[in-house]
Amino acid sequence: MSEMTPREIVSELNKHIIGQDNAKRSVAIALRNRWRRMQLDEELRHEVTPKNILMIGPTGVGKTEIARRLAKLANAPFIKVEATKFTEVGYVGKEVDSIIRDLTDAAVKMVRVQAIEKNRYRAEELAEERILDVLIPPAKNNWGQAEQQQEPSAARQTFRKKLREGQLDDKEIEINLAAAPMGVEIMAPPGMEEMTSQLQSIFQNLGGQKQKPRKLKIKDAMKLLVEEEAAKLVNPEELKQDAIDAVEQHGIVFIDEIDKICKRGETSGPDVSREGVQRDLLPLVEGCTVSTKHGMVKTDHILFIASGAFQVAKPSDLIPELQGRLPIRVELQALTTSDFERILTEPNASVTVQYKALMATEGVNIEFTDSGIKRIAEAAWQVNETTENIGARRLHTVLERLMEEISYNASDLHGQNITIDAEYVSKHLDALVADEDLSRFIL
């Protein structure tokens, strides 16, 4: 679990997301409160429930990007889902309980990686011994059994030194490795994923753990043996319990497009993929117990962050019970021309940096001037205003159009320097931006 302070979390988010300070502060405080809760005594800790967040803002302003970056910072079980993928219980489609099952699967994977990393040093030692046994087979007694030697032989020590120094990396050896489990692919209707995964695990375990001889270079064999030995050192039952604890205490669920499941107008009959989904989400957000293949998971202390553009619907269109369970409201602002300029230059891997790196692979040096970046930002903002406002995503469309000619001819431009200034941008984009019909279909 992350021990970063809210200020550190916001600082880290600032490297990738421009503006939206209120949203960053809210998620940073929510993440820090997870850590604060774990410092309390057990009785009080049980009473402190997370304050779920509802992020409201137009498309392309950074809602989903905040979730993506938060997943990397949290160091906790995290899952992002689309609200539109679910239907009410009893109808064809995914049930909302599958959110917790997927979160638990993600936690098991995360905890397994951590456990393997923790045991890596011991696994490397065991893998080393297995390779040395192939290079220098141990002496055998009269019954054909390997004898236990008190001290490793001088030859074994010499080979161990060479192995650690990488002198034997390209030598080929034959070694027994665990055979890959039998691959069984089962297609099932939506909502029955749990059953298919259980059937797959049954079929895969039918053959037992078989060893298969393989010829490999020592450096490749070492990697596979380390993974195999590390997996043996991990206790599967402990791992499952640790994963369930991590989900219950630190789990975070990000539900995107929640505005798409708001009821629109007066409709008759059941609304299985809108209001029905909201009703099914209630027990998860409030706190219930969900059955997963790894065990029972309580959702009382899982943090839920919901987001939506709410361009057609309003937050008040959500059913009142769900509104009450999302007490923290954060409004993200539409992006301005100056925001677009900052998006093009400030993030660690901004779009302009990506294009420069891509063209550099062909030996073409691209330089974006300040005037060029300003003109690109103005063009993107202008197209957003005259057509659909898709936020920062418009920059990708505009830049792709701007760079099309260079990208196409890059292999013939090796060694050239190209400067993209205001004049270059105007020459390639002005006609499209000015013609509303063209920009509607091309940009």
Swiss-Prot record:
The name this protein goes by in its record: ATP-dependent protease ATPase subunit HslU
UniProt GO molecular function: ATP binding; ATP hydrolysis activity; peptidase activity; proteasome-activating activity
A Pfam family hit: AAA
Protein function: ATPase subunit of a proteasome-like degradation complex; this subunit has chaperone activity. The binding of ATP and its subsequent hydrolysis by HslU are essential for unfolding of protein substrates subsequently hydrolyzed by HslV. HslU recognizes the N-terminal part of its protein substrates and unfolds these before they are guided to HslV for hydrolysis.
Entry's localization field: Cytoplasm
Gene expressing this chain: hslU
Induction: By heat shock.
Keywords from the UniProt entry: ATP-binding, Chaperone, Cytoplasm, Nucleotide-binding, Stress response
UniProt-annotated binding residues for ATP: I18, G60, V61, G62, K63, T64, E65, D256, E321, R393
Subunit structure: A double ring-shaped homohexamer of HslV is capped on each side by a ring-shaped HslU homohexamer. The assembly of the HslU/HslV complex is dependent on binding of ATP.
Domain of life: Bacteria
Family, similarity comment: Belongs to the ClpX chaperone family. HslU subfamily.
PANTHER family, alphabetized: ATP-DEPENDENT CLP PROTEASE ATP-BINDING SUBUNIT CLPX-LIKE, MITOCHONDRIAL-RELATED, ATP-DEPENDENT PROTEASE ATPASE SUBUNIT HSLU
